[in-house]
Amino acid sequence: MRGDKDKGVGYTDTKGSFTEYAYRSLGFDFIGASLTTNQPSKEEIVAQNPDVFVCGGQYQNKNINILKTEEPYTNLDAVKNNKVYNIPIGFTAFEQLSAMTPIFFYDQANKIYPEYFTYDITTMVKTTVKEYFGTDLTDTQVGYMLNGLNPQGGSLY
């Protein structure tokens, strides 16, 4: 689910996007590839009943809250099974082609397959940001990035 614009839960990437490639690489059937629009209705989302939701962008926490608190989303398998995840936000978008792209894959693998992967995302972010941007980050700052928060730990919207 895209959250770069405040378009709500029904805003996603479609076939041919980098996120389709990424989630197919991680072993998923990317639902966005089967949709005819990047803004499916509530009914289309319910009919698909995804096993996992992944939310990115500055509105990710707003969308995650909607999924977890509003009908009809609260009845979806991903929500009931607590498989609603975020994509970190940093100096560049993690889910777009950037210095953070490899970390995006490691982070998502940790979240989606915790029984198999335990990558040290905090260290990866700190090392990458230092190398590419010349900036030292604290664990707290990295935590904000990993949780989709602003540099002070507050909401991005």
Model segments located where?
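N-terminal ligand-binding lobe of clamshell/alpha-beta domains
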Residues: 1-157
